[in-house]
Amino acid sequence: MKKLFLISLFSSLLFSASSEQIEQYLSISKADAQLVSIEQVFDSMRQNQEREDNNSQEINQIYRKYLEEHLSSNELEELLALYRTPIMQRYVVEMESSISKEDMSAFLKDLEENPLTTERLDIVDNILKLTVKEDEILAFYKSMTQRYRKASKKSDNNQTIKPTKQEQQYVEMVKEGSKNELLYGLQVLSIEEMKELKSALESAVISKASKIESEAMIHVMNQFIQGITSKPQAKVQETNSTL
């Protein structure tokens, strides 16, 4: 009986999430909001490419499929339960609110004149570490710039693991922007609420989901890069054949 239970438990942990679970999760967590930014990157990289109307749909499909294949059904149920708690729902709402550059500048200027308590700043820093991982930012940046780094591929063998100056600048820029958004979004939360939020974000399943979402973004980027690097050659061949 014990063996059967363990086998059953193991199977349930490996069982992939369903499309419906992924849809529910993205609806409540707003995790796919980051696809808007990646589409903007694609638009800028597609300057000399013919834009296809189904690109946005393909991006969403690839992203959702990756989550579906790398998160188990049990993990999705756990994530849904966490995101349905009042503190996580409030977190999503507050962080989803947009803010103009002018308002953010005014907010940061006010912070200089009226500094936050050390306790609040420490909690924000801890939440930042939980939600923004340097290695994930760096991996995405490298994926985003791979098309332009092929020319220097021959020197890759001599490169060290240490990020380049440009890569480190990108990481710091993302971290600074994310921290400012946290400071602004969480200003309405009490210290106790922030501690509760930090505790929720420390959950192992949220940490895994964040990692998988980051990998999904990179997967989408890689799929896109492969597409736009192959299309120009096809167009050239087509042009030559018509001459």
Residue ranges of predicted features:
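Sec-dependent N-terminal signal peptides
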Residues: 3-13
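N-terminal Sec/ER secretory leader and immediately downstream segment
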Residues: 17-103
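Soluble non-cytosolic domains of exported or imported proteins
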Residues: 19-20, 53-58, 70-74, 118, ...
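Solvent-exposed, polar/charged alpha-helical surfaces in well-ordered, non-transmembrane soluble domains
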Residues: 23, 61, 65, 77, ...
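Surface-exposed patches in mature extracellular/periplasmic domains of secreted proteins
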Residues: 36-40, 75-80, 91-94, 138-141, ...
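Surface-exposed, polar helix/loop patches in the mature regions of secreted/periplasmic/lumenal proteins
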Residues: 78-132, 203, 214-220
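Extended amphipathic alpha-helical interaction segments
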Residues: 100, 104-191
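A cross-kingdom marker for long, charged
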Residues: 180-243
